[in-house]
Amino acid sequence: MTYAIVETSGKQLWVEPGRFYDVDRLPGTEENSPLALSQVLLINHEGQVTLGHPYVPEAVVRARVLQHRRGNKIIVYKMRPKKGTRKKRGHRQPLTRVLIESIELNGTTLATAQSAPPSTSEATTDTTGIPAAEE
């Protein structure tokens, strides 16, 4: 299992290839554009840990911007008892959804996103649940 811990938008995020993550809005990025995250704090590749001080040199996590979206609405309600003061406000955080494509260290690709799970050629099971009649 290969994963990396990267720093983006002032937060640390554990990322694995082939998964998507919602991070704070990344200004200046467009949908379906490539993105290189170079602030890598740690890389674990099959049990071998590479730790940075604070960042791992020549380590890059390649990602692709899937979409810009907004998070779930958070309701903030302030009330002062016995005063009749009430305030109700909502907030939706702007987010960017990124797909992690690969983790690279010193120019070599350690892990990439799996395009599709391996299919079994012996998938001849009957999905109806009715046993076949014997002749």
Swiss-Prot record:
Q: Which UniProt keywords apply?
A: Ribonucleoprotein, Ribosomal protein, RNA-binding, rRNA-binding
Any one GO MF term held by the record is: structural constituent of ribosome
Any single GO CC term annotated in Swiss-Prot or TrEMBL for this entry: ribosome
Instruction: Give each disulfide bond as a residue pair.
Output: none
Q: Supply the InterPro entries for this chain.
A: bL21-like, bL21-like_sf, Ribosomal_bL21, Ribosomal_bL21_CS
- Provide one Gene Ontology biological process annotation: translation
Q: Where is the composition biased (Polar residues)?
A: 109-128
Q: Which domain of life is it from?
A: Bacteria
Q: Which Pfam family is one of those matched by this entry?
A: Ribosomal_L21p
> Region (Disordered) spans which residues?
109-135
Which family would the database say this protein is a member of? Answer: Belongs to the bacterial ribosomal protein bL21 family.
Question: What's this chain's function?
Answer: This protein binds to 23S rRNA in the presence of protein L20.
How it assembles, according to the record, is: Part of the 50S ribosomal subunit. Contacts protein L20.
- According to UniProt, the name of this protein is Large ribosomal subunit protein bL21
**Which species does this protein come from?**
Synechococcus sp. (strain JA-3-3Ab)
Question: Lineage from the top down?
Answer: Bacteria, Bacillati, Cyanobacteriota, Cyanophyceae, Synechococcales
